[in-house]
Design a protein with these regions (language model features):
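Charged, amphipathic alpha-helical segments
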Residues: 78-102
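Mixed-charge, glycine-accented linear interaction segment located at domain edges/termini
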Residues: 131-203
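Beta-strand elements of well-folded, non-transmembrane domains
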Residues: 75-79, 115-119, 132-135, 158-162
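Short helix-loop boundary/capping segments
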Residues: 100-136, 141
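Oligomerization/assembly interface segments of phage tail-like spikes and tubes
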Residues: 59-83, 147-161
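Polar/acidic, low-complexity leader/linker segments enriched in S/T/G and N/D
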Residues: 1-43, 199-203
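Surface-exposed ligand/attachment interfaces on beta-rich extracellular proteins
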Residues: 53, 57-59, 95-97, 199-202
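Short, solvent-exposed beta-alpha or beta-beta edge segments that form flexible loop/patches at the rim
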Residues: 47-62, 140-142
């Protein structure tokens, strides 16, 4: 099994939107988009398989594809209400509001960010269509005389989706090149439905 890794240096503006509906072979609709926080690092790992068909002692055909996608997102900080929304925690009360970390699976979300394109000097915006986040570990440390930065890191696992475009093919993310960071952020806002404050559909 082959593994493809990607580490991003020069990135930011992580946005998230809850998956409202997904119709296999047609479209996916997002709702309640928001900016997750300030990003430090993003990484993903795409697991691919390759099967060779032999005949007459030679390779006659090769079939390859992506089996799964996973990654991490390190943030400088994240507000508790946004973390609860991302992970699907329930809540009660108002002042103070109590968030209950339950054993339920986190909701499916679409999410994206921009990264610096060193080759062109511009930016590439990436949108992952359908994924689930988890917080598998956390470290809390007392204050000391020296400054020690401790950033929260979230794990995620993505799934392949089948939409009307590209027809008959599975896709897990889109990437678009832009000349400016502002243009990349504007595209991410549209994907997450942040600009109009409502839902957005991709087909």
């Amino acid at each position: 099994m082959a593994t493809g890794n990607s580490n991003v240096f020069g990135m930011g503006y992580p946005v998230v939107a809850l998956v409202d509906t997904y119709t296999d072979g047609a479209s996916i609709t997002y709702d309640d988009g928001f900016v997750l926080g300030t990003a430090v690092e993003a990484a993903y790992n795409a697991e691919s398989s390759m099967a060779e068909d032999y005949g007459d002692d030679e390779v006659q055909d090769i079939d390859s594809g992506t089996n799964g996608i996973s990654g991490t997102l390190e943030l400088n900080m994240i507000a508790l209400d946004k973390l609860a929304n991302l992970l699907g925690w329930s809540s009660s009360g108002s002042t103070p509001k109590v968030y209950h970390v339950t054993d339920e699976a986190s909701p499916y979300v679409g999410f994206g960010y921009y990264k610096k394109d060193v080759a062109s000097g511009g930016y590439v915006a990436r949108w992952i269509y359908r994924a689930q986040f988890s917080r598998t570990s956390e470290t809390s440390r007392t204050k000391t005389q020296s400054v020690e930065w401790n950033h929260p890191t979230l794990d995620w696992r993505g799934t392949i989706v089948h939409l009307s475009t590209p027809a008959g093919k599975g896709v897990w993310n889109d990437e678009v090149a832009f000349e400016t960071r502002e243009a990349a952020k504007a595209w991410l806002n549209i994907k997450a439905g942040i600009s109009g404050g409502g839902s957005t559909t991709v087909s």
